[in-house]
């Protein structure tokens, strides 16, 4: 099973990740990882930090001659901004001058609770690890899972359907055409937009909304649409709660900073309708397996993949750091005070969509590995093809 851990602070020397459980024999290039890191850095509404960083991953272990060797892969992403923080973020040396403590928490952030939980007198340590900068390490780590899935014919893609009130959550008219070519085709089309939207009109409105929010010292969230194509039926399980695929996918998405809601298929719309208007009727194409004319379940029934495209939706709240700060208080003096201001983005929904693609990749990869088993790529792919052949036998006349 694939699992990964990340380490590092937002303004420390580097972010690190260790990825364990990748099968041996998987061909990996630096571009496979660095392309995903570059995608994460893009998007209209990002702050000044992205002008400093040029994220690239150094591979320190687990790959030899361009192939995984079955041992843990260690990745490191340099923080170029570290040179500006060597005093404030010194690891051992006590600074000669006093570093002012941050004592006014930001509403909506980890500041207040993190400070109390870990016994800090300064919010800085909370800011450093709670920061979404950590997701650079996650994107690098999960890029390897995306490579593995791609080798199995499984693709992940996303686009942004709304930012603030701009855009629509109704499916784009071009969606089916793009997904027919695979979810990565959809992602490439979205990448051509500075806000990762598919409709030019929506993009224009979103950019205007971001500009207005920035001018007012405010921030914007949005909704991300995710799709996974090429997934065979039968991944996941209804047998135990921790093997339910929809639960694992939802947990992965909610783990992203500022993501506060997840939808599978058209779940919230379904909740307002009778079952006869919700469940996807089954038809049999003789010799070619089951067919559904709708996909309101989002490709998952009974917590297992049903052979359709997986559709997920994630809601990202507006970023908690406001240039026109909300009311707060000083944790030391307990006096009322406007909340702390930290360098931040106005809108990071496009970046979040790339992160969302990343974090669901190990979930699908592990569901596949639980089905096939295997320690090297060749045997896994052989078993996958055999499994697909077994599925097809059920629908032969």
UniProtKB/Swiss-Prot annotation:
Q: Could you describe the subunit structure of this protein?
A: Homotetramer.
Which reaction does this enzyme catalyse, per its entry?
Answer: 5-O-(1-carboxyvinyl)-3-phosphoshikimate = chorismate + phosphate
Spell out the molecular function terms from Gene Ontology. chorismate synthase activity; FMN binding
Q: Which UniProt keywords apply?
A: Amino-acid biosynthesis, Aromatic amino acid biosynthesis, FAD, Flavoprotein, FMN, Lyase, NADP
Alphabetical list of Gene3D superfamilies matching this protein:
Chorismate synthase AroC
Q: Which pathway, per its entry?
A: Metabolic intermediate biosynthesis; chorismate biosynthesis; chorismate from D-erythrose 4-phosphate and phosphoenolpyruvate: step 7/7
* Protein origin, superkingdom: Bacteria
Keyword Signal attached = no
Q: Which cofactor does it need?
A: FMNH2
Q: Would the keyword Amino-acid biosynthesis be found if you checked this record's keyword annotation?
A: yes
Q: Which GO terms describe its cellular component?
A: cytosol
Per the UniProt entry, the Enzyme Commission number(s) are: 4.2.3.5
Q: How is the cofactor bound?
A: Reduced FMN (FMNH(2)).
Residues that coordinate or bind FMN: 129-131, 257-258, 302, 317-321, 343
Q: Provide the taxonomic classification.
A: Bacteria, Pseudomonadati, Chlorobiota, Chlorobiia, Chlorobiales
Protein name in UniProt: Chorismate synthase
A Pfam family cross-referenced in the UniProt record is Chorismate_synt
- Function as written in the Swiss-Prot or TrEMBL entry: This reaction introduces a second double bond into the aromatic ring system.
Q: Which GO terms describe its biological process?
A: amino acid biosynthetic process; aromatic amino acid family biosynthetic process; chorismate biosynthetic process
Q: Which family does it belong to?
A: Belongs to the chorismate synthase family.
Give the binding site residues for NADP(+): 40, 46
């Amino acid at each position: 099973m694939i699992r990964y851990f990340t380490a590092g602070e937002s303004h420390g020397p580097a972010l690190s990740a260790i990825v364990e459980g990748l099968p041996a024999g998987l061909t990996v290039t630096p571009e496979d990882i660095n392309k995903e890191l570059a995608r994460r850095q893009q998007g209209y509404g990002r702050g000044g930090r992205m002008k400093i960083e040029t994220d690239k991953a150094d591979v320190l272990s687990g790959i030899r001659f361009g192939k995984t060797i079955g041992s843990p892969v260690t990745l490191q992403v340099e923080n170029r901004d570290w040179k500006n923080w060597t005093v404030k973020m010194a690891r051992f040396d006590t600074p000669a001058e006093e570093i002012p403590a941050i004592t006014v928490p930001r509403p909506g952030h980890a500041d207040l609770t993190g400070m109390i939980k870990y016994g800090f007198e300064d919010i800085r340590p909370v800011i450093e690890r709670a920061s979404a900068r950590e997701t650079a390490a996650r994107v690098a780590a999960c890029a390897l899972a995306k490579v593995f899935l791609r080798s199995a014919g499984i693709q992940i893609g996303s686009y942004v359907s709304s930012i603030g009130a701009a855009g629509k959550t109704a499916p784009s008219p071009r969606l089916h055409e793009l997904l027919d070519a695979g979810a990565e085709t959809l992602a490439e089309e979205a990448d051509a937009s500075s806000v990762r939207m598919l409709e030019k009109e929506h993009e224009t409105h979103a950019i205007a909304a971001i500009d207005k929010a920035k001018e007012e010292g405010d921030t914007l969230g949005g909704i991300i649409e995710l799709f996974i194509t090429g997934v065979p039926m039968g991944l996941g399980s209804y047998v135990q709660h921790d093997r339910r695929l929809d639960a694992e996918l939802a947990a992965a998405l909610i783990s992203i900073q500022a993501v506060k809601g997840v939808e599978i298929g058209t779940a919230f719309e379904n909740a307002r309708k009778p079952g006869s208007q919700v469940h996807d009727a089954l038809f049999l194409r003789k010799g070619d397996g089951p067919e559904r004319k709708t996909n309101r379940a989002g490709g998952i029934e009974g917590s297992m993949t049903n052979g359709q495209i997986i559709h997920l939706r994630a809601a990202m709240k507006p970023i908690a750091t406001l240039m026109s700060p909300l009311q707060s208080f000083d944790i030391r003096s307990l006096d009322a005070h406007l909340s702390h201001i930290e360098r931040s983005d106005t809108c990071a929904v496009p970046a979040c969509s790339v992160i969302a693609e990343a974090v669901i990749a190990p979930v699908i990869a592990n569901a596949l590995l639980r089905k096939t088993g295997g320690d090297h790529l060749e045997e896994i792919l052989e078993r996958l093809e055999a499994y697909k052949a077994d599925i097809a036998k059920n629908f032969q006349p």
